[in-house]
Amino acid sequence: MSFRTKRVLFSVPFYIIFQFFLLKYIFLLFGGVDDVILIVISILIGLMRCIPMFFEERKSTTVGRFFQTVDGIWMWASLMFLIDVVLIYVLNSFITLPKFIVYILLAIVPVLGVYNYYNATKLIVNSKILEFDNLNRNINIVHMSDVHFGSVRHKQIISQIAEKLKELEDSCQIAIISGDLADGSSVVEPHDFEGLKDVKMPIVFTPGNHDFYMGIENVIEACQNAGIIVLDNDNFEFENLNIYGLTYSFDDIPTPTPDEIKNSLNPNLINIINYHVPYNWE
């Protein structure tokens, strides 16, 4: 059982209780619903959070991904509705809110959901220029992080990234992914990343924490099948660049010592440390 699965199973009882009280307050705004009905709905929401996860651990399916997506959307909506009901409660302590104001506040959540989903499925390229004296020529790097391939964003996100990288092939020389290529919500199968195989620039990847949840060996195998260069506490030289991939370390996964990292750096090149999280730099 993966770390993510254990974490979700531990949280499900609390999640069900949270759902019950959230739904109870929301329905009270409209006159109320019998508690038995709310208990059943809350339990079903809790089951939807954990049951598809067991199937997705073994083999990702369309049905499993659908329920995981619904769960993810509802979990986000629940947090937004919580903010809504707290705001409504506070305002009602001072004034009596007209019903139409309550309806507007609640309607903001699905509107925001549609807007955020639209933005989350778009790939936007932002540019930043860094200047160094010891570069022979301009090098454009595509930097990505937290792709989170999984049940919610499955092969379509890989296809999107592949198409975007192909668009950038004439202007960019290398792509770097700094962790969480997978999110651990579904098993990564050997050919899941093969959509990136046809990209005509090197793709470098260093694991983040989520990449370990369903088995880092599965993520590495899928990367290798797609021609992705995996840097697991290792370095890769490209033109005037020396890229060192510092793998995310936790539990029994040790962090390389400062001396080990320094020995992998090249004073004659531009050194880039590819690391998932911005801490431990001291």
Q: Where do the PLM segments sit?
A:
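Non-catalytic terminal accessory segments
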Residues: 1-123
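A cytosolic-side transmembrane-helix exit/cap motif
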Residues: 58-61, 123-127, 217, 222
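Hydrophobic alpha-helical transmembrane segments in integral membrane proteins
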Residues: 110-133, 151-156
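Context-gated lysine
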Residues: 6, 24, 59, 99, ...
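Soluble catalytic domains of enzymes that build or remodel membrane lipids, polysaccharides, and related
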Residues: 131-282
